[in-house]
Amino acid sequence: MANLISWINIAVVFGSIVLFGAVGETLTEKAGNLNLGTPGIMCMGGAFGFVGAYLYETSVGNPNAFMCILVALGTAFIVSALGGLIYSFLTTTLHANQNVTGLTLTIFGVGLGKFFGTYVIPKGAVSTKADFATKIFRARIPFLSDKLGVVGDILFSYGFMMYLALIVAICATLFLTKTRTGLNLRAVGENPATADAAGINVTKYKYLATCIGSGITGLGGVYYILDYSKGTWATASGTAIESLAWLSVALVIFIRWRPVHAIWGSYLFGLCYWAYQFLPKIIGIKVNTDLAKMIPYVITILVLIISSMRKSKDNQAPASLGLSYFREER
């Protein structure tokens, strides 16, 4: 039982990182922008959020928990949103190719994140740690996690960022399905010319969706550093965040662009990713590490094949996804 609970715990934390990225990318893609710069943006969010928290706690004699959280999340969100702004300017205003721009942003973002993350590593060391921020981000709910036995271990033994990820996913779903602004955003992603003719400012919606979506993605990066990796930034942290961000991109396809489904989808990805470590202990079956880590991508490919065979409009990507909109051609 202990191994099963440990498997669920690490899968939930792992999946929550992917969940931030998937929700952010879903908002972006709902506006018709295919942002393959997600890995770079998440890396920037992780690096700058960590550096912000580290500099705050080392420069203040008695750091405040709320301010530490505000600095870490605020820095991560703003820097990541700026990455989305760069992408929006290049693709929406200058009509650059979205695929090339996104991949370029990934290379740039990962490199920039590694550079600034390494800035706070002491000379001669390979890593550094933000102890106070880690304590805050990894703090569990005292009563619920300690007094409810197995239920507490499974549901309440996480830091606040896990629950924030759930809230963000649910709010994104309600926004896209229940609000006029969300419906306008979906209209922009499906048919920008028609949306423009109806009086919707296509450019504004694309910019806002991409910047806010990128900001949410960046929160996944800072969650990875300050909780999942126990507040440690190492020279290899940027590469690790990049790999999880690609899982987020795959998850968007897997959930068919529905943020609420990203909740269970991200946890499923987490369980599959860590199966190689826990299945041998639980049922005695040895699982190849590389094959286990491939499972989420294989599942995504199968979903793509099945959905294309069904040809249901509900299972398809936004019609204008990846396409530049030229207003003069409407």
Predicted regions and their residues:
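Hydrophobic core segments of alpha-helical transmembrane domains in multi-pass membrane transport
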Residues: 21, 46-50, 110-114, 162-174, ...
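Transmembrane helix-bundle core of multi-pass membrane transporters
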Residues: 109-177, 232-233, 238, 283-292, ...
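Transmembrane alpha-helical segments in multi-pass inner-membrane proteins
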Residues: 217, 227, 231-297
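Cytosolic-side transmembrane-helix boundaries in multi-pass membrane proteins
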Residues: 190-197, 203-204, 279-330
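Alpha-helical transmembrane segments within multi-pass membrane transporters and channels
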Residues: 62-112, 273
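Membrane-interface helix caps of multi-pass small-molecule transporters
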Residues: 27, 51, 55, 85, ...
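Helix-loop-helix "hairpin" substructures at the membrane interface of multi-pass membrane proteins
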Residues: 154-233, 264
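Membrane-interfacial amphipathic/re-entrant helices at transmembrane-helix boundaries
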Residues: 1-22, 34, 48, 57-71
